[in-house]
Structure formats: structure tokens, C-alpha cells
Amino acid sequence: MSARRTSREIAVMALYQLELTGPPLKEVLKFKWYDKKTEPEERDFAVSIVNGVVKNQEQIDTLIKKYSKNWDFSRISIVNKAILRLSVFALLYSWEVPKNVTIDEAVELTKEFESEESARFVNGILDAILKNETKSDG
């Protein structure tokens, strides 16, 4: 697994934990709950993702709500919210990864943590956000 993939996986887990139990962000970002060996750069990238999502969460959630047609935001699973938030942050606020790669990675993470059906749901929302809210860069 690539370092970036590991970082995204850690970030999804951290965002999940924040949503589920609401511990202080500082505590979550210590990653004491993550039991796999990671490199400092993997943790640093995960921290930057989580901090970016938390900083921009209101705008991110507004877009997720806008494009999750026929789904009340409260019905979206916590895991799917975490993946969507991470991915919308990457699409709108990060230029490190091509946008199509961001969506592909989100779909794979969703398949890993949730299901094929959830992956289609996440893909649909992210694709709509990509088409309507971002400048295209592939």
C-alpha cells in the first residue's frame, strides 16, 4: 500500500472517530488508536488532511448535502461521511493529487470500509462535485 493511501486510511479513521465520539482533535491526531506501523510522513499527511477537513467542514458538508440527492445527510453513514469529507477537501482545497485519482481512491476506500453500493453512492456525489464545483484538471 502506498504511503498516501495509508495516510488517507488513517485520516478516514480519525475523521470517523471525531464524528462518532467527538474527542478533542489534538487527542485524535496523536493516533494512539492506530496500531499499524507508520512512517512520520504518513502521519504528517494524515494530520494535514484531518486539519484541512476540520477547518473547512462547514463548506464541505454543505456541498455533500447539496449533491446527495434523495439522501438526508443524517442517513449517510459515518464512514461514508469521513470518506466524502476527505475527498471533497482534496478536490477543492488540495492540488497535490489529480482529481480523478482522488475520486478513484475514495471509491476504493469506500469498498474497503463499506460496500460496493456505498462506493457507487460516494462516486456519484464526488463526480457531481467535480463537474459542478471545480475547475477541471483531470
From Swiss-Prot:
InterPro entries xrefs: NusB-like_sf (IPR035926), NusB_fam (IPR011605), NusB_RsmB_TIM44 (IPR006027)
UniProt source species: Leptospira borgpetersenii serovar Hardjo-bovis (strain JB197)
GO molecular function: RNA binding
Transmembrane spans: none
Taxonomic lineage: Bacteria, Pseudomonadati, Spirochaetota, Spirochaetia, Leptospirales
GO cellular component, one term: cytosol
Keyword line: RNA-binding, Transcription, Transcription antitermination, Transcription regulation
Superkingdom of source: Bacteria
Similarity field: Belongs to the NusB family.
Protein name: Transcription antitermination protein NusB
Coiled coil: none
Function: Involved in transcription antitermination. Required for transcription of ribosomal RNA (rRNA) genes. Binds specifically to the boxA antiterminator sequence of the ribosomal RNA (rrn) operons.
GO biological process, one term: DNA-templated transcription termination
